[in-house]
Amino acid sequence: MSTADLRLRWAIALLLAAAGAAAEDTCDRNEFRCRDGKCIASKWVCDGSPECPDGSDESSETCMSVTCQSKEFSCGGRVSRCIPNSWRCDGQTDCENGSDEQGCAPKTCSQDEFRCQDGKCISQKFVCDQDQDCVDGSDEAHCQAATCGPAHFRCNSSACIPSLWACDGDDDCEDGSDEWPQNCGGRDTAAAWSSSPCSSLEFHCGSSECIHRSWVCDGSADCKDKSDEEHCVTATCRPDEFQCADGTCIHGSRQCDREYDCKDMSDELGCINVTQCDGPNKFKCHSGECIALDKVCDSMRDCRDWSDEPIKDCRTNECLDNNGGCSHVCKDLKIGYECLCPNGFQLVDQHRCEDIDECQEPDTCDQLCVNLEGSYKCECRAGFHMDPHTRVCKAVGSVAYLLFTNRHEVRKMTLDRSEYTSLIPNLKNVVALDTEVANNRIYWSDLSQGKIYSALMDQAPTLSYDTIISGDLQAPDGLAVDWIHGNIYWTDSVPGSVSVADTKGIRRRTLFQEKGSRPRDIVVDPVHGFMYWTDWGTPAKIKKGGLNGVDIYSLVTEDIQWPNGITLDIPSGRLYWVDSKLHSISSIDVNGGNRKTILEDEKQLAHPFSLAIYEDKVFWTDVINEAIFSANRLTGSDVNLVAENLLSPEDIVLFHNITQPRGVNWCERTALPNGGCQYLCLPAPQINPHSPKFTCACPDGMLLAKDMRSCLTEVAPVLTTQGTSTIRPEITAGAEGLPKHKEDQSASSTSRQPALSTVESVTMSHQVQGDRRNEERPQGVGVLSITLPIALVILLVFGAILLWRNWRLRNINSINFDNPVYQKTTEDELHICRSQDGYSYPSVSMPFCGREEAASKLKDRS
C-alpha cells in the first residue's frame, strides 16, 4: 500500500471522527442545547424551572430572546415569559412581575347587575336580600324594609317568599315563620311532615335530615340544628380512665400505647413517642445502652461490652479504600462509614445510589410527571398551560363558573367573584345539579316537587323549564350527566336505587337497587364507561359500576361513615369525596388504590355536602357554615372562603369545557340508529381492550330478546279454558317501531299484550312488575287446577294396580320342587290358574329350554 493511500485513509477516519463528535454536540430540532452540551426539550426553555445543570435554559440572556405567539401575552421584565391571552386581566396574577393584571379597565356591570365597592358585579336580586353577597357588604348598605307583593308571604325576618311555599310543611323562611301555626290558621304543618322517610334505624333531626341512630349523643353534632346532641347524658369516667372525644371511657394505660382504643382515635392524639438512641448524636451499644456519639472511640469504656471502642474500626477511614465501595458519596464515621446519595437518588444495597422515580407518587405534579435522572419535570395536558408564577396547570379557553344550589335558586359565580348572579330563581328545594357544557344546558332536581328539570343556560332565568323526569321520584339527591351518550343518571335514597334515562326523559331504567342502601351523590366517566356513587347506608361505602349497570362492586369500605358529595378529576384519574361524619376530604384512584386524606377539619368541614374540582383547587359546600370553601386539592392547604351567608348550599359543579372532554358515542357509530337497540343504548365499561362498546337495555320489568336488542315482556300463561281452546304463553315486543317477537303458537286462540309507545314506555316499565305480582295469584290457581287432577288420576291408577295384584295373588297356587340331589328348592314356580272349567296350566318359559322340552319336563314332574 502506497503512502498516498495511507494518508487518504487517515484523512477519512479523521473526518468521520470529527463528524461523530459534531453529531454528539448537536441537539435535535425540538431540543435546546445547554451550555454544558446537554440537550433538553425546547418547551422547557424559559418555563420558570431550570432543567439544564448550569441553568442556562432559564438565564436572562436566553429568555430575553423568546418571542411570544399571537395568542400569548409577554410578561416582559428581566425574564420574559409567555402566558395565554385569556389570562390577561382575569383577576389572578400569572406573571411574576404582575404585568398581566396591570392597566386593566374596570369591569363593567350589566343593567341587571349591582356593582360592589370593590368593583365586583353581583345580581341585582341579591341587593337588600339580607344576605351579604359583596365581600365589602355594600349590597346590604342603605336598605329599607322589604315590601312583599300580593303573591308573596312575608317572613318574620322581613324576607319575601312565594305564597305557595307557606304552610306546606317545609321551612322556607330562614326563621321557619312560614310554617308557624299562627301563620297557618292554627294548623301544625310540622306534624304532617313528621312522617319522614327515615327508617327505624335512623334518627329524624329537627331540621328534617335523617342520620344513623348510632350517631345520636356521640359528642359530634350531625344534624344541622344539632338536635342529635340535645338532652344527652354525658358519661363520667373514673380517675384512672381516659375519656375519648366521643364520651366513652377506656383504661388510662391505653392512652398513647400506639394502638387506637377509642373509636374516634382520640387516645393517640398529642402523644410523643420517643425511641431511644434516635438521632445523629446517639450511639446504641451492642449491650443495649444508649450513649452520646462523642463518647465513641474516646479510649474510655462507656458500653459494658466495649462496643464503643473497637480497636480495629476506631480511627480507620474506610472511605480511602475505593471510596468505601460507595457509588457516590462516602462519609467516614467514628466506627465504620456510610454511603450517601445526592438529591433525587436513594441508597440501595447499602452502597449503590439509584434514581428516585418521583412520578410514582400520585400528587408529585399537578397533572403530568416526567421522571429525569435525579429529578423530575411537571407538564400539563392538552387544554392546560403551566402558570409560570404558581407552577400550576391552568385551563385555557372559556371562563370557568361555579354553579351551586342555594335551596330556592341556582347561583352562578366566577372563581374571583367578579360576576355573581342568580341563574335559576324561584325554586322550591333544589338539591342536585349538573351540566352539559357542549349544549350549554343545566339539569337539576327539586326535592319538594319530586322532579328533574332542564333548561338552557342563557334562557335559565325565564320560566321555560323542561321537565325530564316527573314520576316515581322520592329523594333524587344525586344527579350526573353523561355528556357523550346523552343520558342522565340519578340516585334515590328512599328506595336505594340508581337509575338512568335519556336526556329527554323518554326512556328510563333502574340500574341498581338494594335494600338498606342509601345512595347519595353520583358521578360518571363516560369516556371509560364507569359511574361512581356514595352510599351512607349500613355499612357506608363508595360503589363503582358500568354505566350500563354491570360489574357493580364496593370500591371503598373502610374508614368511611357518612360519604356525601363525590366528584371525579378525569385528567388525574382520581375520585374525591367528603365525609360529613369524619369532617374530611379524601381521594383515591379509580381502581381503589393510593388513598389519601387531603383535609380534616371540624370547623371548615362541619357538614360538607358536595364538592367540585378545577385545576389545583377543590371547592365544597357546607350546610352548617352555610358557605363555600376552597383548598389545594393536593395538599389541603390554602383554605379560602369563596361565598358565605348562603341558605342551605348543597350541590356544586364547575362549568368549563375542560371538565367534560370529548369522547366517541359508539351508539351512533353503527349502521343502525341507537346502536340497533329498541330501547336504551348504554355505554359498557372499558375493563379491557376486548370489552364491548355498548349494550342494549330495556325498561324495568322487561327482558332482552335473543338478539340482545329487542325488549320482550312475558304474559302469564293460562293453559286451559272452557271448551277446547288453549292459550299458550306469548312474548311480545315492548317498544314502538320494532316488530313483535312471539314464541311458536299452535293454539287456536291467543291473548295479546299492547305494544309500548316510546312516550308510554317509561310508565309501562314500572307497571309491569306490579302486573306480574297481580298475576301471580291466578297463575298459582291455574297450576293447582292442573296438578291436582293429575295427582288424583295417578292415585286411582296406583290403587287399581294394587287391587289387581292382590286379587291375582289370591287366585294363584304356587308349587315349589325340592331337588333331592342338591337339597335345594328350585326357583322355578309353576302357577296353576283356576278357571271356570277347573285348572289350566299357563305356558312356562324356562332358561335354555325350548317349549317342547319345557312341556316334557312338566309331564315328568307331574
Swiss-Prot record:
Q: Where is the LDL-receptor class A domain?
A: 25-65, 66-106, 107-145, 146-186, 196-234, 235-273, 275-314
Listed transmembrane segments? 783-804
List the record's Gene Ontology CC terms alphabetically: apical plasma membrane; cell surface; clathrin-coated pit; early endosome; Golgi apparatus; late endosome; low-density lipoprotein particle; lysosome
Residues in the Extracellular compartment per record:
22-782
Region spans: Clustered O-linked oligosaccharides? 721-765
One of the GO biological process terms: receptor-mediated endocytosis
User: Which InterPro entries does this UniProt record tie to the protein?
Assistant: 6-blade_b-propeller_TolB-like, EGF-like_Ca-bd_dom, EGF-like_dom, EGF-type_Asp/Asn_hydroxyl_site, EGF_Ca-bd_CS, Growth_fac_rcpt_cys_sf, LDL_receptor-like_sf, LDLR-related
Q: Give the Cytoplasmic membrane side ranges.
A: 805-862
Q: Which cysteines are joined by disulfide bonds?
A: C27-C39, C34-C52, C46-C63, C68-C82, C75-C95, C89-C104, C109-C121, C116-C134, C128-C143, C148-C160, C155-C173, C167-C184, C198-C210, C205-C223, C217-C232, C237-C249, C244-C262, C256-C271, C277-C290, C285-C303, C297-C314, C319-C330, C326-C339, C341-C353, C359-C369, C365-C378, C380-C393, C667-C681, C677-C696, C698-C711
Keyword annotations: Cell membrane, Cholesterol metabolism, Coated pit, Disulfide bond, EGF-like domain, Endocytosis, Endosome, Glycoprotein, Golgi apparatus, LDL, Lipid metabolism, Lipid transport, Lysosome, Membrane, Phosphoprotein, Receptor, Repeat, Signal, Steroid metabolism, Sterol metabolism, Transmembrane, Transmembrane helix, Transport, Ubl conjugation
Subcellular localization, as worded in the UniProt entry: Cell membrane; Membrane, Clathrin-coated pit; Golgi apparatus; Early endosome
Segment Required for MYLIP-triggered down-regulation of LDLR: which positions? 805-862
- Entry domain remark: The NPXY motif mediates the interaction with the clathrin adapter DAB2 and with LDLRAP1 which are involved in receptor internalization. A few residues outside the motif also play a role in the interaction.
- For this entry, the protein name equals Low-density lipoprotein receptor
Recorded source organism is Cricetulus griseus (Chinese hamster)
Which gene does this sequence derive from? LDLR
